[in-house]
Structure formats: structure tokens, C-alpha cells
């Protein structure tokens, strides 16, 4: 951990990590904790460190011991704090304060990269390797809910790396190959499936009721969610990009392979 002047405040070794890509998920802040996803090809774990000191506060083993790279999300659902994580041959929810598991869904594949999204009704997961799946999950269960809490599932158009988005009644996703889909978020009915062009590594983002998809070629496709496929705009950075865009104070930031771009008025 570093302060804003770049001075290191603490460092912590929470255990071994065997993976081709190292720690690729983002740490997550929760109250006075820093939570780290330690899914790897060994004694996998999720761990929480004291934000001020770096001391270990809790560490929960992950029994499947399989590499994954998803960043957990934390939401309050039905009055219960949940930290939900795709990875290590499962989708599971934990109490972020203690690391105790609320519920788990087995599979549906081995490795995950994309983070989940939540729309107040369902959690949406997409992955992974070696098989691709999209799941909509009712997040109010306890124990193993594999057979009871999957609202709908789809395999065509699932992504491995890019995270999806939800806008109103619509769930939008782009596959790694650049094929975008729009679903009815509640029912799982696909409204359309269209090729955007080029591979996609960046996660989708939303702003002003629109969805933004940045391709590996650096082309941003802006789509209005709906039952019909509608491209609002298409912008070419003339530079490749593999990073997810970010929005701050009305401006869009995209990191290309050579430049950082700021787009706005």
C-alpha cells in the first residue's frame, strides 16, 4: 500500500500464488479491509487484509484450487452483505466481513476473468475456459444452490475476458471475438446478436443510457440498448487498446498501447 505521495506504507505476503498471469484481479476495499482474490493452481484462497496495517484479518480456502482472475463485487442484497466471486470452478458469495460463505453454484466452467454485474434482481456471470456460459442468478440462497437459483442461462455469445453491463431491462455483452448481444435481463430472451468487428478485451461501460464497447483495434462502438440493434456512434482512436475505459467528471479515458486518451468537451 502506498500513500498519495508514493511512499510505501506496508506490504504483505498472503501466501503462494501459482498462475501464468500472476495476480490479475483488482483488490477490493470494504470498510477497513482490502480483499484479494487468490484463486490459483495450488492452495487457493480469498484473503482480507487490514487496510491500515496490511495484517491478515481473515483467509478462506477455495477448495477447487484452479486459477481465475475475476474481481469480486460487493453488494447489499436482501439486507445481507455479499461479496460475490466467479472463479475456481464455481460462483460463490461470502460475507466480506468474515469470509464465511453464504452460497455456491458449481461450475459451470473452470476459469473466469470477467466480473459479475447486478441489477437489483439478478447477478449476471459470464465465462470462461474451457467452456463459455452466461448465467443469471437469484442471489438470495444459502448453501449449494446449483439446482435452484439459476434463473436463465445461455452459451452463445458469452465472453471470457470482457465484463458485461446491465442497462434498465437489457443485459449487454460482447464476446472476445467481437460479437455483441442484447438480452432481456429478466427472461434471458436474446433481442439481437451482431458483429462489432475485431477482438475485444476491454469490459463494457455505460454512460447516459448508452453502452460503450472498445475493441482491441481501438474502435469504440456506442450502442443504445433496445430490442433493435442501434449504433449511436463509432470512433476510431487509430491505436490499439486492450484496457477497459473509465469515466470521470464527464470525460472518457481510454488507455491505448502508446497513449492515454481523454475524450470530452
Which residues fall in each region the model found?
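Noncatalytic, solvent-exposed loop/strand surfaces
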Residues: 1-265
Amino acid at each position: 500500500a502506498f500513500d498519495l505521495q508514493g511512499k510505501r506504507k506496508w506490504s504483505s505476503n498472503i501466501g503462494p500464488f501459482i498462475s501464468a498471469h500472476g495476480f490479475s484481479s483488482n483488490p477490493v476495499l470494504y470498510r477497513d479491509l482490502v480483499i484479494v482474490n487468490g484463486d490459483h493452481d495450488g492452495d487457493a484462497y480469498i484473503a482480507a487484509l487490514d487496510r491500515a496495517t496490511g495484517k491478515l484479518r481473515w483467509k478462506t480456502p477455495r477448495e477447487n484450487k484452479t486459477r481465475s482472475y475475476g474481481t469480486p463485487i460487493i453488494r447489499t442484497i436482501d439486507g445481507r452483505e455479499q461479496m460475490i466471486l466467479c472463479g475456481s470452478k464455481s460462483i460463490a458469495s461470502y460475507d466480506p466481513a468474515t469470509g464465511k460463505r453464504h452460497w455456491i453454484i458449481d461450475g459451470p466452467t473452470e476459469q473466469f476473468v470477467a466480473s459479475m454485474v447486478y441489477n437489483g434482481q439478478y447477478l449476471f456471470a459470464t465465462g470462461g475456459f474451457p467452456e463459455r456460459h452466461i448465467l443469471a442468478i437469484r442471489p438470495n440462497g444459502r448453501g449449494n444452490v446449483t439446482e435452484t437459483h439459476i434463473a436463465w442461462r445461455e452459451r452463445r455469445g458469452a465472453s471470457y475476458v470482457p465484463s458485461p453491463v446491465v442497462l434498465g431491462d437489457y443485459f449487454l455483452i460482447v464476446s472476445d471475438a467481437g460479437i455483441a448481444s442484447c438480452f432481456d435481463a429478466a427472461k434471458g430472451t436474446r433481442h439481437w446478436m451482431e458483429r462489432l468487428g475485431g477482438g475485444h478485451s476491454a469490459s463494457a461501460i455505460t454512460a447516459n443510457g448508452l453502452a460503450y464497447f472498445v475493441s482491441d483495434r481501438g474502435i469504440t462502438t456506442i450502442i443504445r440498448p433496445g430490442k433493435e440493434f442501434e449504433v449511436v456512434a463509432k470512433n476510431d482512436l487509430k491505436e490499439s487498446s486492450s484496457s477497459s475505459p473509465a469515466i470521470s467528471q464527464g470525460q472518457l479515458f481510454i488507455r491505448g498501447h502508446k497513449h492515454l486518451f481523454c475524450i470530452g468537451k
